[in-house]
Amino acid sequence: MAKKKERAVNVSGKPRHSLDVNRANDKKGAGGGAGGGGGGRSAATVRRLKMYKMRPLRDRGGKILKHDLQSKELPNTRIEPDRRWFGNTRVVNQKELEFFREELQSRLSNNYNVILKERKLPLSLLQDHQKQARAHLLDTEPFEHAFGPKGKRKRPKLMALDYESLLKKADDSQGAFEDKHATAKLLKEEEEDGLRDLVRHTMFEKGQSKRIWGELYKVIDSSDVVVQVLDARDPMGTRCYHLEKHLKENAKHKHLVFLLNKCDLVPAWATKGWLRTLSKDYPTLAFHASINSSFGKGSLLSVLRQFARLKSDKQAISVGFVGYPNVGKSSVINTLRSKSVCKVAPIPGETKVWQYITLTKRIFLIDCPGVVYQNNDSETDIVLKGVVRVTNLADASEHIGEVLRRVKKEHLKRAYKIEDWVDDNDFLVQLSKTTGKLLRGGEPDLTTTAKMVLHDWQRGKIPFFVPPPQQGEDSPSETAEPVDKSDEEGVSSDRTAAAMKAIAGIISSQQQMNVPCQKEFGVTNEDSEVAEQSE
């Protein structure tokens, strides 16, 4: 067979084929020439063009003889007849599975326990799935009476035999729907009492919009640990039971932690009582958000590091901070970072959308807007919880009566230098004259004065707190006075020592209950000792 001659490279100015290296590019500025234009094709261009013409070499029968840019077919192989290739990798009998299921349910009832290596557990076998309700058609009417030669009806009878049973079934389903949705039930109770607010300003529905709830669910879905921030002055009033129910039903693998913020506004015995009460449900920490002088920062960092170690199968964990508006979620994040990374303000609704903050390489923080779950709170309760901005209130004086009822008279005398008053209107008139809030003609400006009082209420200048239930031996009598920030400058050394002793009592009680706690008051070092959770 004659040897095939190789095509010689054309050195003339006009190449004969497109694969010639010396062929110039058509476009100016392209090609492999040194000058950028008029040069020959580069080696990469030649290889690319040659690739377009490459095909596998086949014989007359179509069998591939030589592969070119094709995957080679592996020859038929024989698998070694070993039991390890075909046997079960993990085997468990019914008795062991039942024992493990009971043990798992008993351990998961305690919110301080954490499942390790969730991906290796057959959770689908350990959880009892709810079965769908079946319509027992054969109990209502036999099969032969509905179909076949003896059939008497064109359709089989359903659960409702007549209109009365159908109406009863509809009423039952409506009752179940109303029980599930608390708002409908509350409206029904209001109608029975004969009182119902037909018109309510949209301002009192802040934190309940679809957009805000969407932000909350995005934060929950993205978080491995959810920290619910509560106001230490009214923890139960700022607690969202709907969120806890949602996590139990739909996200059992996520962990919930309570954070009692603003504990500097309440006495130590009240903080201790709320820690005992809330720790029965979820891990609870006391916290005071401040970049310079914080309390509880070491405990919270220790808990977050512990969760990061427990989630060792993940590269990083996300911690979402949720709660009512104006409870200090953004301030807590700024305290953990020791600098201002989130926009904060003493007014509700400052955070509009969720925000990712990097704490460490393995811990990320998520700031969430304040969310309010619709309940039977009145407009005054909504204002006093800090959900509504005081500057937007049309008539702020109508909420002062509740403030005078909740706060002791001696604290108001000490704060506003007013000796006595008859009602809320008289109180506002005297305060307007004292502070110089007057209109033309010397008339008192009641609206501006009322807004000033509500601002002082929301910012903690007026001492107020809800006492914890089942007060123990450490709690004082009912005549105990709340913390008054106006006397902080004149506190003697004896009272300071007593306060430090009470805080030490809180820390010791947390250690006895296996609650993560901060070892020293005022410690902000991130390398503090890790608190251990109960197993």
Curated annotation (Swiss-Prot):
SUPFAM superfamilies on file: P-loop containing nucleoside triphosphate hydrolases
Region called G3, residue ranges: 367-370
Segments of skewed composition (Basic and acidic residues): 17-29
GO molecular function, one term: hydrolase activity
Region feature (Disordered): 1-42, 464-495
Family: Belongs to the TRAFAC class YlqF/YawG GTPase family. RsgA subfamily.
Leader peptide range in chain numbering: none
Region of interest (G5), ranges: 290-292
Compartment annotation: Nucleus, Nucleolus; Nucleus
Ranges of residues in domain CP-type G: 213-374
Superkingdom of the organism of origin: Eukaryota
Gene3D superfamilies named in the record: 1.10.1580.10, P-loop containing nucleotide triphosphate hydrolases
Ranges of biased composition (kind: Gly residues): 30-41
PANTHER family: GTP-BINDING PROTEIN-RELATED (PTHR11089), NUCLEOLAR GTP-BINDING PROTEIN 2 (PTHR11089:SF9)
A GO CC term attached to the entry: nucleolus
Function: GTPase involved in pre-60S ribosomal subunit maturation.
Coiled coil: none
Protein name stated in the entry: Nuclear/nucleolar GTPase 2
Region (G4): 261-264
Chain segments carrying region G2: 349-353
